[in-house]
Amino acid sequence: MERWQNIQNVVVVGLGITGLSVVKHLVKYQPQTHVRVIDTRELPPGKESLPESVELHSGSWNSQWLAEADLVVANPGIALATSEIQDVIQAGTPVVGDIELFGWAVNKPAVAITGSNGKSTVTDLTGVLAKAAGLNVGVGGNIGIPALDLLELDADLYVLELSSFQLETTSSLNLAAAAFLNLSEDHMDRYQGMADYRDAKLRIFNNAQYAIVNREDKETYPDHSMPLVTFGLDDQEFGVATIDGTEWLTDNGKPVLPSQDLTLVGRHNVANALVSLALLKQVGIDYNKSLEALKAYNGLTHRCQVVANKREIKWVNDSKATNVASTLAALSGLEYQGTLYLLVGGVGKGADFSELKPVLAQLDRVQLCCFGEDAAQFMPLHPSAKTFDTMRDIIESISAQLVSGDMVMLSPACASFDQFNNFMARGDAFTELAHEYA
């Protein structure tokens, strides 16, 4: 391939799952290159899996290797503002990421999704629906399997979740369609402000044939002119409309599926479903073949996932909600007939939880159950708020009063590491409690 003609020395910065996928890809498909790895950690994860031909410098930077490189492939966790990377850029050496290498190598259609919240669900759902339509699909990127490993599948379609970090080093990924779901404050430790963060996200549209954007969030629109497909919770393009008293997901006014047929919980997931339908349409897939799969889809583990539904009491695991924006999204348009028992708390990371107060005030019959290190910070948000030490304490306290129509939802708006190793362990603990008490 022409772009590799003058590339002999490649330095991969940062190992781990992504770095290892880059190394394996280079060794297999660009055997003429000399591959070296720099990782500032003493014992980088994946070290034991490195091919023997690949040199590793660990525990610090290696400025000589960087100076000798014709190409540097940086892990998305490493900010381009890092002084060592800035030196490489100033010297005129290209700095790319694994997604850029994927873009150089892929020869089948690809779609990608970015956004502050919901991108993992849309990525997974789009893959599920494309598979239901009969395609061999590779799903990954920022979620699950690294993009370069997906190339081994020789899929008909690739569906990628892309983070702002990955997009910073991506400039020539040709996408059949790209979706930008929403924009809310995140990663402000990495970016100079919201404009900087948005600019990174907008790179997803650079070589895309179609931009799928949120009518309710103009920040998701590209800054340059290109074909647009919009989604939202009104009756335009991909949207919703009430027909004979029933709300339907619609495609330019054409009814597709009643929203009540979705297993997914929450209004944000209605929007997520619309994005997946739009992505399928733009790559020429008949989404009507996938509607049964859409109805049955119950979400990614730990993301507004219905983990039990007995005696008409729904238990919803949204442990992935580690920030306020995620919990706000989960609460938006939440439908339940009885009382909502909302479990919040953990490590607040200095967040301002006051945004939750007006949303909680609008909900019918809510019991705010606060636990963990920063439980007290949630107490002023609702008159029903009570504090507990642990999740189990909450469930033991409320289980006897649960009745048909109630919903028990873990959407903590906090990190988990006061009581759990990670948000997955927290979600698993909630799921076990749900099965025990449902």
Swiss-Prot record:
It comes from the Bacteria. SUPFAM superfamilies: MurCD N-terminal domain, MurD-like peptide ligases, catalytic domain, MurD-like peptide ligases, peptide-binding domain. It is found in: Cytoplasm. Its EC number is 6.3.2.9. InterPro entries: Mur-like_cat_sf, Mur_ligase_C, Mur_ligase_C_dom_sf, Mur_ligase_cen, MurD. The keyword ATP-binding applies. Keywords: ATP-binding, Cell cycle, Cell division, Cell shape, Cell wall biogenesis/degradation, Cytoplasm, Ligase, Nucleotide-binding, Peptidoglycan synthesis. Pathway: Cell wall biogenesis; peptidoglycan biosynthesis. One of its GO terms (biological process) is regulation of cell shape. One of its GO terms (molecular function) is ATP binding. It is an enzyme of class 6 (ligase). Pfam families: Mur_ligase_C, Mur_ligase_M, MurD-like_N. GO terms for cellular component: cytoplasm. The keyword Cytoplasm applies. It catalyses: UDP-N-acetyl-alpha-D-muramoyl-L-alanine + D-glutamate + ATP = UDP-N-acetyl-alpha-D-muramoyl-L-alanyl-D-glutamate + ADP + phosphate + H(+). ATP binds at residues 115-121. PANTHER family: UDP-N-ACETYLMURAMOYLALANINE--D-GLUTAMATE LIGASE. Cell wall formation. Catalyzes the addition of glutamate to the nucleotide precursor UDP-N-acetylmuramoyl-L-alanine (UMA). Belongs to the MurCDEF family. This is UDP-N-acetylmuramoylalanine--D-glutamate ligase. It comes from Vibrio atlanticus (strain LGP32). The gene is murD.
